[in-house]
């Protein structure tokens, strides 16, 4: 064996052993039997490239892809186990239906294996029952930021062009909706202006509610490298409500009270405007920005009826705050521009127009910042009782100075600490506020950067538009021009698409509870574990009139409360694509056949589409008392369709689709179960052997989808190109990706919009504004702010539920490094399970001593809504201050979302999982 072969074999063996896969001695000398191919990691929004080895129909090893620009050959601990997530002992391999002894569906029955045909028969029956009784609003789809792009696009098309419902919403509503609103309100277009290259180019990394060391560990390795490259110059600051691993290399750690990030941002802005006006980039502001604001009295996204029959008495005092709050000294000071004082009742009069905004003058903007002095902000925000007020003030000053320093490049990163927030959209806007004031946005090494949580929350949920109000490429159902564009691309009649936005994710749950939705289909997520105030939704799922379908790979909580479970193919058992946090789109090929009778979510969507004729769905449909969708059947006939054509025929197996060659050269040497079937000879939804669709369905879906963005600043490359590269950052124009958007040096569309300028914020959403002051708009005449961004003033407001005498602790939830989301996959990897076998209740030693607790004691964590048992950890990786506990949500045996509050940001409808009040006592 020569030196090169020795190194190669050693590397392969090392990668396999890291991933927990044994390497027989025979393999050590014959790795050429392994077939390697590039793919994408299944987990977070970082978008790491990986290499996958397959042998004898199984994935046998994974390793980091050295050619991948995101991770450069590294993986985190989860990434190394991409192979093992696929082969858990309880992998779902056949459809399961609740049935009685006679073989009939029975809501109270036990799960029994059934054929795909029997599963789809019952699914069709129950769907049509709800659809015919309640109309297009009577059904719902829980989608995902973990859909492949093709899966999400197929689901969106079936729902909005087929069923004419907008009740499809992804679990990305839980993670990125506030970021989306922040982008759309500020820039007029979604997704970051910067890219990961900013890490190597910046002088300062400031994390806000983003424990990157655990949640984006590969990006954190790049941050660490940058810090080590120049210890004196490069500064790292970690702002959090509790101490975590991201603080380990931080120059400054700032522990603040929950929700007071709003006040800290306004303090920084005040420092700039009042005390360092020379730091303001006045030319940038004048040429490229306007000042704006909106209403403050917008509620907290809870039900506005505290007397709803499903509420327990203990819940009502919190829910009452949806309509009115009593202002304390601190909140009254922040809202003083509205003429209020401490003790006033503050009514939420603008819940229905939370997203309305208008232009204000710089003088009004400055007036809004007036209360946020260092003294006020430090008093309001200091989160650690062990820290002196003076020390906290010094940290705030140091933080402001880092932003203000004239030639210092600054990147602000955030994730769920910002987004899962009752004012999440506001705090996103505030980050841009400070960066715009300083002219430190959309420049290499400087910018406010929202990090994505899920692997395709950007690529699928946001870009495809699988939200209840959206269409692809930032279009929305409420806009008639956007509907027209979509209907033309989809080749469906005008007025097919429902113009009324549907129910967001949490509201689908509420609608199930209220009987407004009676059929729900869950795809690629676990809503009954991931949604706050879960006791309500468990009861709703088990209501006799409701029918729940869950497509999944393992039996998680959602599957356990379902009526029908469909076994889904996992990531490398199908073709797909993801889009990451830096706008990088990456594709992969099917590597192995699915386990058992599992099939892809795309296949499930298309097979279900076969069950519906146009005359059943494109007829006249009542939406509500104000809106009835017209029949479009005559128009369909004029387009060459028959009313007896199925949605599959029209939407997915049309003439264009069938033009995509199933034997395309790009697919040579790889399986494609959806296109050709496979050796398992699966009995399909019609009871016959499924032999494939006979056309390259994934390529068709991709090429049709990309039509939405071409020429509109969302340009994507063709299907084949992505299989030759390690991803591209859109917009991709003339074969070239874009690193920094809105900057005319780098962005084709910015240059096109403003050829004689340095920047152009060319997004066109909400770019017609009226004028007003801090209180309200003052005229109805709109003016254009084309190519400009908004600098928002948003006040500090407190969370609706805060610690009290009865419930004295804040509760925050989140993730840990070793597990992904609800743990459905990672808890089945033995090595990851052994590393972190249960979710712990992290708390301070002082609180533990006060409660008479020892390390490892079992405690009850109880709120007004529910309680769970968890084991106390006072010495672990997370170190909360006195008065706060942190419990991750990956463990279904520590079902923490029974405890959390279903309050949301009223603009984004994203749940605040970081703030509710609990009591802790020994179990």
From Swiss-Prot:
Extent of the signal sequence: 1-30
Claim: Electron transport is one of the keywords in the record: yes
One cellular component term from this protein's GO annotations in UniProt: periplasmic space
GO biological process: Mo-molybdopterin cofactor biosynthetic process; nitrate assimilation
Coiled-coil residue spans: none
Domain 4Fe-4S Mo/W bis-MGD-type, chain residue ranges per copy: 34-90
Protein name: Periplasmic nitrate reductase
Organism: Campylobacter jejuni subsp. jejuni serotype O:23/36 (strain 81-176)
Organism classification: Bacteria, Pseudomonadati, Campylobacterota, Epsilonproteobacteria, Campylobacterales
